[in-house]
Amino acid sequence: MSNLEKFMSSKWLILAIVVLIYLPVSIDATVLHVATPTLSESLSLSANQLLWIIDIYSLVMAGLILPMGALGDRIGFKKLMIIGGILFGLASLAAAFSTTAWALIGSRALLAVGAAMILPATLSTVRNTFLDEKQRNFALGIWATVGGGGAAFGPLLGGFLLEHFHWGSVFLINVPIMLAVIIFTIF
C-alpha cells in the first residue's frame, strides 16, 4: 500500500475533511467586519441593520450549538455534518445574492444554523476518530488552530475579496469548499 493509499484510508484524511468543513465556519464569523462600508453603500443599510447582519451569525450559532450536539447524538454526527454543510452552502449562495438587508440577515441566520450543526459534528468526529490520547490531543490542536486561524484570516480574506470582487464573493467562496467536503464525506 502506497503512502497516498494509506493517507486516503486513514484517520488523517478524516481530520483533513473535518478541518476543511470547519474552516469556512470560523472565517464567516469575521469575514464581514471589513465589509461594513461596502455593505452599507450597496444595500443602503441603517446602523441597526448593519449590526444585525454582523451579529446574527454569532448569536444564532451560540444558541444552537448545544441543541445541535444533542441532535447529533440522535441522528449521528456524520449525517449532521452533511446536513449542516448543505445548509451552510445553500445559505452562502442566498447571502451572496441578497438584495435587501433582511434577506442578508435571514441568510446569515441560516448560515449560523448550518455552522451550529457543523461545529459539534466536527469536534465529535475528531474525538471519536482519534482513540489514542496523544494523537487525539494533536488532532484537537489542529482543529482548534484552524478555528482560530480562520477567524483571524477572515478580515484579510474579506478585504482581498472586496478589493477585487463584489461583496457577495465573501460568501461564494464557501460553496465549492462545502461541495467538495460533502462529496468526500458521502463517498
Model-derived regions: residue spans:
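Transmembrane-helix bundle of Major Facilitator Superfamily
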Residues: 2-187
